[in-house]
Amino acid sequence: MSFCLRLAGIFCALLMLFGCGPDRNAFAPVCPTAHLIPALADVTRYAGPGPTHDVTDLILQARVTAVNGSCAAGDDSALLPAKVQVTLLIQRGPAMQGREADVPVFLAVTDGDTVRDKHVFAVHVAFPPNVDRLTITSPDIDLDLPVSANKSGASYGVIAGFQLTPDELTANRRSGG
């Protein structure tokens, strides 16, 4: 009988230890809002120079279709760790040499109208045989946002788009992007 009482005592002590830890009534941190700017959400690449192109000159077309992320309370209360992924729809064109390409994408963190940080990275796409259209999601992009009692993650915005050349940006604006 004393063995059972000792076992019950150990069990109760373990239950109390498992109850220790972060405040269970604390709310999850608020993440920044993601934005897509139409003029930066599309890219069309052509072979050869010139302002006009035929469909046979098309290397690839791509569109940012989603920006997703998550936040979690970190060890440092002055920083909010966030993970962001960018989802792209990519179409291979007839002028594409090979079946692989790197598409330059950017992620910018804004604070009001100010860009606080910008990260440019390449999303690699490899088209399998007989597949000319893919939806892919970038690897996680880790962000650490400075927060305080007066400034939450909701104070920030995240903008994703393609790192365009001046000609590509002009073409997007002309086409209504």
Across the structure, where does each feature detected by a protein language model lie?
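Bacterial N-terminal signal peptides that target proteins for export
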Residues: M1-G9
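C-terminal motif of bacterial Sec signal peptides marking the signal peptidase cleavage site
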Residues: L15-G19
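Bacterial signal peptide processing site
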Residues: G21-N25
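Post-signal peptide N-terminal segment of mature Sec-exported envelope proteins
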Residues: F27-P51
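Helix-rich interaction surfaces within compact, conserved domain-sized segments
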Residues: A28-V30, R116-G177
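Short, solvent-exposed beta-strand/turn "edge" segments of beta-rich domains on protein surfaces
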Residues: H53-L60, N68-A82, R92-R99, A149-K151
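Beta-strand elements of well-folded, non-transmembrane domains
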Residues: A66-C71, V84-P94, L107-D113, V125-P129, ...
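A short, structured loop/turn motif at beta-sheet edges
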Residues: D76-L79, V109-R116, N150-A154
